[in-house]
């Protein structure tokens, strides 16, 4: 099957087409080309677009017809997860080891399954330095055992990836971040594409048009000023 895609013009690389112009097959593919500069990535996320491509492919930009999202105030951990956390030695932090979280999200996946290639790692670490990319870490004593990272776009957190090296670590990262995000006036967590794991955690499907409308409203509204300061989000001893 031949696919004809528009290509980002280098001199206008932060200008994306309307996401309603994305293809139906493959679902959500919008445009190719450009680069992973900070300006281009921030513009993409502000418009509900994200990069996703394989090694050797051009950069492909997506906005699927159905989005996976969390409304953090609705996130409800199971009784078993709460009990597990209370009995564990886990502690949860925010922005204490973002570079490490990005590296582990990439390295803990089979090579053929990861889209987090060296150029993407470099690009998102640059966004860390600029204050746009943030992480949640889960520790067992001093060992980093799970976490997630993503971008802040106003009152929206655009989740990129998560990893878990020990039982329930990524679930606890998401739970504690939802609690913190709500208290900081955060409204929406974008998961990009729905999958069974996210659905099992309570993610909901949202049509692209509805997501676009909500994103346009929320991306210009701020969270509280201390939302992304490096801090502890909770430990099993005081959960």
UniProtKB/Swiss-Prot annotation:
Its main location: cytoplasm. It catalyses: N-terminal L-lysyl-[protein] + L-leucyl-tRNA(Leu) = N-terminal L-leucyl-L-lysyl-[protein] + tRNA(Leu) + H(+); N-terminal L-arginyl-[protein] + L-leucyl-tRNA(Leu) = N-terminal L-leucyl-L-arginyl-[protein] + tRNA(Leu) + H(+); L-phenylalanyl-tRNA(Phe) + an N-terminal L-alpha-aminoacyl-[protein] = an N-terminal L-phenylalanyl-L-alpha-aminoacyl-[protein] + tRNA(Phe). It comes from Aliivibrio fischeri (strain MJ11) (Vibrio fischeri). Functions in the N-end rule pathway of protein degradation where it conjugates Leu, Phe and, less efficiently, Met from aminoacyl-tRNAs to the N-termini of proteins containing an N-terminal arginine or lysine. It is found in: Cytoplasm. Belongs to the L/F-transferase family. Gene3D superfamilies: Leucyl/phenylalanyl-tRNA-protein transferase, C-terminal domain (3.40.630.70), Leucyl/phenylalanyl-tRNA-protein transferase, N-terminal domain (3.30.70.3550). GO terms for cellular component: cytoplasm. GO terms for biological process: protein catabolic process. This is Leucyl/phenylalanyl-tRNA--protein transferase. Keywords: Acyltransferase, Cytoplasm, Transferase. InterPro entries: Acyl_CoA_acyltransferase (IPR016181), Leu/Phe-tRNA_Trfase (IPR004616), Leu/Phe-tRNA_Trfase_C (IPR042203), Leu/Phe-tRNA_Trfase_N (IPR042221).
